[in-house]
Amino acid sequence: MEELQGYLKIDRSRERDFLYPLLFQEYIYALAHDHGLNKSILYEPMENLGYDKKYSLIIVKRLITRMYQQKHLIIFTNDSNTNFFFGHNKNLDSQMISEGVAVIVELPFSLRLVSSPESKEIDKSMTTLRSIHSIFPFLEDKLLHLNHVLDILIPYPIHLELLVQTLRSWIQDAPFLHLLRFFLYKYHNWNSLITQKTKMILFFSKENQRFFLFLYNFHVYESESIFVFLRKQSYHLRSTSSRAFLDRTHFYRKIEHFLVDFRNDFHTILWLFKDPFIQYFRFQGKSILSSKGTPLLMKKWKYYLVNLWECHFYFWSQPDRIHINQLSNHFIDFLGYLSSVRPTPSAVRSQMLEKSFIIDIVIKKFDTIVPIIPLIGSLAKAKFCNFSGHPISKPAWADSSDSDIIDRFGRICRNLSHYYSGSSKKKSLYRIKYILRLSCARTLARKHKSTVRSFLKRLGSEFLEEFLMEEEQVLSFILPRISYFSKRLYKERIWYFDIIRINDLTNLS
């Protein structure tokens, strides 16, 4: 136990400097603005949202001046309709301050990573970006030998005040924590929305997305910290992760309380973590824990996680947020793919002298398919089709030029083809391409006040093939010796190493 407590001690020499004065620095808002430009969504550039036109250095200077004049600041608790400042751009002021707070609150975590002894190793790993697609070959290698999975939706805190209390162990600036609490109460309705089953990403308003994404990621980080720690103590080995941030675990106060209650059962908990075949992976609020153990062991895992979250982290954990499934008859919904491990029977003929034998064997195969129904729902929300999958025109784009319309549809189609190139069955992907192709034709026909048939007859259907077939042309150029490459392209799974973010339409599903 002394070794355990020594591991949990916080380095008191790394006290955090005051963060509140940074709120009055112009470069903070410039950094937040640049980050917003780089995170524009797939089919709506940031300039179309009007954000770029509203931002200027003069507005930032005026905002900072009003912040110095505290008489213009309205402190409130429950009235969400009350604005921050008196003036004409109240919503813009609120947006800019929240984005500045999001940049500032990330500084202690970034500084801790840079000042750590492992910073050189982290910097080296960051230079080579790891593709999202790289996890699927890993799953194919590991899941073939496992039997059960825990399909977990990470729980939410009972109250947003718990997030502030958790941040106190990282941030020592009391005024800044009060300001953070000020913003949380301004968006107090978010506290009731997060308890629902709908994905968290839908509740992040565009103007405050970074602020809430940071809070949610920090919340997930804390919930996983105890899991990572016990895993290390069980094997006395270092954990590896595709995100170096996960390995920097500091949760002294919570573990100290945890040891009081579980001192006698600590060895039992470590035994639970000594499953040599366990695999854990997560993206956003969805995590998968797979094991070769029995259903009884998986039930113990579920019981342990629920009690840990509710009793020691005060997270909202509902019974239907953790499901125990068997890999052989269940699809794993992860990173926009439906993955499964299916037994494939095959016959092998064996010849021994004059006798031959036919041996029936079963081989496990890892399949990844495109979730067609959620994707059609995403296309319907984006107004490319109705919820039955029937393509419709995009009236909002009808005022653009023909080349701009084709370029937008082409960019969406190429990104979808690029992201779902690892699908085992391409039939669903064909349907998505068909919806986008016909939606593009309907949009152009609407613009020229014509029917789709007459429009395609006049211009020909070849003009739509250019952006739909670009991926095949590029791959044919890379592998020119394969004469039948175009046929193999739609049968083989292709994983790319430049996928650094999940497809936006997948997030909408």
From Swiss-Prot:
The keyword Manganese does not apply. GO terms for biological process: mRNA processing; RNA splicing; tRNA processing. PANTHER family: MATURASE K (PTHR34811:SF1). This is Maturase K. Usually encoded in the trnK tRNA gene intron. Probably assists in splicing its own and other chloroplast group II introns. One of its GO terms (cellular component) is chloroplast. It is found in: Plastid, Chloroplast. The gene is matK. It comes from Clematis lasiantha (Pipestem clematis). Signal peptide: none annotated. Its main location: plastid. Belongs to the intron maturase 2 family. MatK subfamily.
